[in-house]
């Protein structure tokens, strides 16, 4: 996986966002071991301290659980993962709507475009 970061926010926050998406998309399964700080830091080409900050964010959100010397696991509480997904979906929709409003898109036109897109997508599957 190619990791890329921008200068708009802290790298640790960007990493937390990437890993959060990976968890809610099922790359890392509920109750299963999570890669170590060193493994992820190497993969992302970042300092282990930066990766540790990112994982602490996910622990504070309840997505990761530290098991002493055994490392971390993804929470087995699927409601925590589902809630994280819902929050991400809402944030995405808010951004899309805000961008549409800034382009002069009305609610009616927005809904029309969404429905048309889904119809095209359904016929292409």
Where are these regions (language model features)?
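Extreme N-terminal segment that seeds HTH/winged-HTH DNA-binding domains in transcriptional regulators
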Residues: 1-33, 83, 87-123
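A short alpha-helical element within helix-turn-helix/winged-helix DNA-binding domains
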Residues: 33-44
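Short, Lys/Arg-rich nucleic-acid/phosphate-binding segment
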Residues: 34, 66-74, 78-79
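Short secondary-structure capping/turn micro-motifs that flank functional sites
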Residues: 39, 74-75, 116-117
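Residue cluster at the C-terminal edge of the helix-turn-helix DNA-binding motif
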Residues: 43, 60-63, 103, 120
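Alpha-helical DNA-recognition elements
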Residues: 57
């Amino acid at each position: 996986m190619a990791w890329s970061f921008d200068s708009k926010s802290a790298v640790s926050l960007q990493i937390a966002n990437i890993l959060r998406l990976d968890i809610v998309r099922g790359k890392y399964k509920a109750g299963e071991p999570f890669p170590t700080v060193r493994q992820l830091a190497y993969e992302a080409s970042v300092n282990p301290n930066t990766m540790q900050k990112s994982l602490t964010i996910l622990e504070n959100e309840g997505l990761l659980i530290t098991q002493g010397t055994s490392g971390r696991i993804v929470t087995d509480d699927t409601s925590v993962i589902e809630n994280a997904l819902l929050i991400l979906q809402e944030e995405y929709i808010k951004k899309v709507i805000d961008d549409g409003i800034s382009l002069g898109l009305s609610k009616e036109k927005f809904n029309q475009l969404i429905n048309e897109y889904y119809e095209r997508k359904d016929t292409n599957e």
